[in-house]
Regions:
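Active-site scaffold segments
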Residues: 49-51, 59
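Basic polyanion-binding and macromolecular-assembly surfaces
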Residues: 1-30, 35-49, 70-73, 78-85, ...
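Short active-site loop/helix that positions an aromatic residue
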Residues: 57-68
């Protein structure tokens, strides 16, 4: 049964504010930044904290779609376009799904065959204004995730960029510091020995350290899906629906996962009820199984999302060679270490 997206028709974005709680105990470890540490800030309600940044959440929304045991997308999503990078022996190295800069990864740029040159040629950007429809069609062909998580093809042309159409972050409000500490014990020689060169710098001796964790009155996962941007790609009804469903599938898969962000940072949903949208009252985030349903005896998943993937990747007898050439595909390149 198709997922009803009609409540979204008159809206330009879809917002969720998902209440979370610490899975065990009260303390949690937020993300940290070099020379800054935890990102605390003041709001009218008091002291708040950035628990997980937008860039980190983009990686996590990708990770729930990736199967590390097979180095491929999770089975219901296989067929979606991305670039796989292998070494000269044919072993998997990385992919555009996993790379921080996606298509602009140096492992793709410096690989063979020259995928970047092929992409640049298909975009047709050299010494010309950006042909936006041609640009997004090319990105769809090689890495559909870039249309959701954004991409900046700086090494090709500084004008080739797409903003995120799904963005998420986690904040905590009413935070307080939970100070603690620990010690690294040296079982052989607890005291330092400067004369012998056995100092803390080299890792010798007992090394005490401070540790700051946090408690919070409220923890919230904020998510925004830019429906106007997705529709503005002009890629047709099927691709537009695929992108919206894929964005929602990523969010649902993340909140259904253990949400263990770090060693001392595990969350779960605070409320067990339906996840309703903040700005579209009649829309609730579907359950994960609603997107993919079940795997049939023929190996195909019967849900609408995998069905759309098959429709948009499989060749149809009536299609022209030009249309077939624009379809999503898995591209494999080789990077020599």
């Amino acid at each position: 049964m198709p997922i009803d997206l009609s409540p979204l028709d008159k809206h330009y974005d879809l917002l969720f504010e998902v209440p979370l709680k610490v899975r065990q105990g009260h303390r949690f470890q937020p993300t940290g930044f070099p020379d800054l540490g935890a990102a605390e800030f003041d709001t009218p309600e008091g002291r708040s904290l950035l628990v997980e940044s937008a860039q980190s959440m983009a990686n996590r929304l990708e990770a729930v779609c990736w199967d590390e045991s097979t180095n491929d997308l999770v089975e219901p999503l296989r067929g979606l376009s991305y670039i796989a990078v292998k070494d000269s022996s044919g072993s998997f190295l990385t992919s555009s799904v996993l790379e921080a800069h996606r298509l602009n990864s140096p492992y793709i740029e410096k690989a063979t065959p020259n995928c970047h040159a092929e992409i640049q040629n298909e975009i047709g950007v050299k010494n010309r204004p950006i042909d936006r429809p041609r640009f997004v069609k090319t990105v769809l062909k090689y890495d559909v995730g870039s249309l959701l998580h954004g991409v900046f093809l700086e090494s090709m042309d500084g004008r080739l960029r797409i903003a995120r159409s799904i963005s998420a972050f986690i904040e905590a409000d009413g935070v307080k510091t939970a100070a603690s500490g620990g010690v690294k014990n040296d079982r052989v020689h607890a005291a330092k020995d400067e004369a012998g060169g056995r100092t803390a710098k080299e890792g010798f001796g007992n090394l005490p350290f401070p540790r700051d964790e946090y408690t919070a009155e409220k923890i919230t996962l904020y998510t925004s899906v830019d429906l106007a941007q997705i529709r503005g790609y002009g890629l047709g009804e099927d691709v537009t629906r695929l992108l919206i469903l894929l964005a929602l599938f990523k969010l649902r898969s993340f909140v259904d996962s253990p949400m263990r962000l770090r060693t001392a940072c595990s969350f779960e949903l605070r409320d067990d009820g339906d996840m309703g949208s903040k700005n579209v009252a009649e829309f609730k985030l579907p359950k994960r199984e609603a997107f993919i349903v079940e795997r049939g005896e023929n190996g195909n998943w019967s849900g609408e999302l995998p069905a759309l993937v098959r429709k948009l990747t499989g060749a149809q007898p009536t299609e022209s060679d030009e249309i077939k050439a624009e379809k999503m595909r898995l591209t494999t390149v080789t990077f020599t270490i």
